[in-house]
Amino acid sequence: MIEKKILLTDCPDDKGLIAKITNICYKHQLNILHNNEFVDFETKHFFMRTELEGIFNEATLLEDLKYSLPEETNCRLIGTQRKRIVILVTKEAHCLGDILMKNYYGALDVEIAAVIGNHDNLRELVERFNIPFHLVSHENLTRVEHDKLLAEKIDEYTPDYIVLAKYMRVLNPEFVARYPNRVINIHHSFLPAFIGAKPYQQAYKRGVKIIGATAHFINNELDQGPIIMQNVINVDHTYNAEAMMRAGRDVEKTVLSRALDLALHDRIFVYKNKTVVL
């Protein structure tokens, strides 16, 4: 059966890598629909994303690539089927609402398996879209206890990605390790500036002239994970902290949905706490 798949390759840079990869694909009678590559000259590392069509013998293809490419090569062959996400929320609706609307009208090609909140405020919004909402309250629980319950509920849906749509709790290291490079967060500032809570108040006090938002994968350092997408807007001295917050919400939802779209289409490589987007 003819299928479409995406081949993601990264390895130490060397001469002739593109030719080697494309020749192997040709020998497997696979048609290359799109191809993008990048070399990081500082780290001497090569990245390539290849969209393929044909009849796949996945094990043999990956074995041939491994034999022909440098020893430290990473190759992944990914199907193009629709991906599943679980969204985590607290009380703010703008990022969640944007994802729900874009998914409803087909602008995001994703299955939203469930939305989980540590408060119940957004249940009505979610259920209007006929999507399950689950309350996993943090009250009277330690962070570890709450995150354990949260992970158990998430795992019922086997998502490809977990999206933190203004989820306002810090996740413990065990939770993060359970989903490496699969948890996407939106931070309400242009990282690495103004990490942590109340970034707009911090920005106002500093008299900044731009405010922004950052979507990133989470790791065990607060707001320090690999950055996927950023954007900014101009502000001036007439903006107080509340006006900055209102303007920032528009940037946040746009940046998060763009980052999610990149992940859904397998365009992100994570390397040395940075991302390469192809």
From Swiss-Prot:
Q: What is its EC number?
A: 3.5.1.10
* Stretches assigned to the ACT domain: 6-85
Top-level EC class as recorded in UniProt? hydrolase
Q: Does the keyword Nucleus apply?
A: no
Q: Which GO terms describe its biological process?
A: 'de novo' IMP biosynthetic process; one-carbon metabolic process
A molecular-function term among this protein's GO annotations: formyltetrahydrofolate deformylase activity
Q: Any idea which UniProt keywords this protein has?
A: Hydrolase, One-carbon metabolism, Purine biosynthesis
Q: What does the record give as its pathway? A: Purine metabolism; IMP biosynthesis via de novo pathway; formate from 10-formyl-5,6,7,8-tetrahydrofolate: step 1/1
Q: Active site located where?
A: D223
Catalyzed chemical reaction(s): (6R)-10-formyltetrahydrofolate + H2O = (6S)-5,6,7,8-tetrahydrofolate + formate + H(+)
Entry-linked Pfam families = ACT, Formyl_trans_N
Q: What is the role of the protein in this entry?
A: Catalyzes the hydrolysis of 10-formyltetrahydrofolate (formyl-FH4) to formate and tetrahydrofolate (FH4).
The UniProt family comment states: Belongs to the PurU family.
The name under which this protein is listed is Formyltetrahydrofolate deformylase
Name of the gene this protein is made from: purU
